[in-house]
Amino acid sequence: NHASVGDLVVLIGGSTGRDGIGGSQFASDSLENEDRSAVQIPDPFIEKLIIEVVLEARNEKCINAMKDLGGGGLSCAVSEIAESLGIGIEMDVDHVHTKESGLFPDEIMTSESQERMLIITDKKKLQKLRKICDKFRIMCSTIGYVKSDKMLHVKKGTKTLALLPAEFIARAPLLDRKSSKPKYLNGIKREKKIRKIPNHSKTLLRLLSSPNIASKHWVFRQYDHEVGIRTVVKPGFDASVLRLDNGKFLSAKIDGNPKHCYIDPRQGAIGCFEEACRNVVCTGANPIGMVDHLQFGNPEDPEIFWTFMESLKGISEYAKFLRVPCVGGKVSFYNETASGPIKPTPLIGVLGIIDKTPFLPSATNSGDYIVIIGKTKDELGGSEYFEYIHKFIGGACPIVDFKDSKINMLSVLSLIKNKLVKSVHDCSKGGFAIALSELSIFGNIGCDVNIDKLPCEKNLSFEKLLFSESHSRYLLTVDKKNIELVKQFLSKKKISFNVLGKFSGDQIKIMYKSKYAIKCTIDIAQKKYFNTLGDMLKHG
């Protein structure tokens, strides 16, 4: 990034309109009535064209500095780029291309209309930049120029509307809010006594139809996720993988768990982060970066602000440990309804890189072994089992052991790299029983496992073995010719693992204390898993 006096300030992309005016304030304000002007209207096609414009303009050296227009629109983008480069900018709102006439200057400056980029270019490169924009039919307006006075000068024709130091606008003073630990946390970690479940097979099928667990294919199939013919691993399992132009592959996944974050905001946030990393690792990718979207209630409430701060501490702590940088993010406050605030909801997106051939799970065959990596603990707190089956949110939230987390990840990546596994799937929502069922559902083959072989803490109940959502666990599908090599490799790593059983037949069978405690056919499990969410959304 650099800029010289006399360089031109150019706005490219979508037209500026009333949509999105005050959008960031709207996202951080108490909702008392509907405000349509605050809702941005996206256009993915224009966004794609802008990406092409930026890439070509970069290659033609038409860009000295650049900033996307997000929260606050032009008012923030212009002041922030001026402050960061130590320059001044004079701009004219009359030169901004708009969707409609009659927009007031303050509306033009604060509109958050989507798909817009601010570019600083050399005068000599302006015509080249315009030609590139014309090629992709993207609008391009010269709205100002660079000065040396470090001031933001906003004009309408010859009339000065604002003249302020760019630093004053870009570096707003920080607000030191009060925080206090929520009172509800004092008793929520106590596990209430729950009724005995007579039929665990029915319980498993019920959980497979839970909206939080059931397949989301009804949603993502409504958008063509193969545009550009770059999708190598499609959405619906652990993470998606895209082919990049440089021959490498990009793995991407977003995860969140409000129930865990409600019980323990810090550990819940770490768990979301680790789950996203696990999913990326399951595709053979090494996590290289993350983004977050932090959604909370009213930060003026000390208890809500405490949950926000705890979540941030957890995310920061795990990011530093893994050395995975946070490359972007978004915060949305005041998410409340008449019934109260939402649960603390950090969403974590993780990107991973695969340098060579991507890991594509191969077909599961009868006789393939099922191996688990990771330890199951007394951590049913915030589980799908507790909420969906027993209508209870509480108990001991899963805690990430940083050492186990890293060594388990690296071990899985090594197994994939050495082509010793046919597929990898992480254990998360619903616990071991759901992860195992998903392997059978996607492989269209039954399984026969002995849950007594599960690496775990002592004296865990059958329900906790099945449905605890302990972190850092992976299920591996291993060909019989490789099983001894896998066992030798994992034994040397001194991590918790075991061979639980094999794939065979057309039933999901789980043995406990020498008896089959769960038996259900694959076709019924598939119907529950694939059809429930669509039926619910279509028919209520």
Q: Which residues does each predicted region cover?
A:
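Mobile "lid/hinge" segments at catalytic clefts and subdomain interfaces of large enzymes
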Residues: 1-136, 144-151, 155, 170, ...
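Short loop/turn elements that form and flank the Walker-type P-loop nucleotide-binding site
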Residues: 5, 173, 235-236
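Bulky hydrophobic/aromatic packing residues
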Residues: 12, 256, 308, 465-467
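Non-catalytic terminal/interface segments that mediate subunit docking, oligomerization
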Residues: 22-25, 181-423, 428-433, 437-458, ...
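Glycine-/charge-enriched secondary-structure boundary and capping motifs
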Residues: 70-208, 318, 322, 327, ...
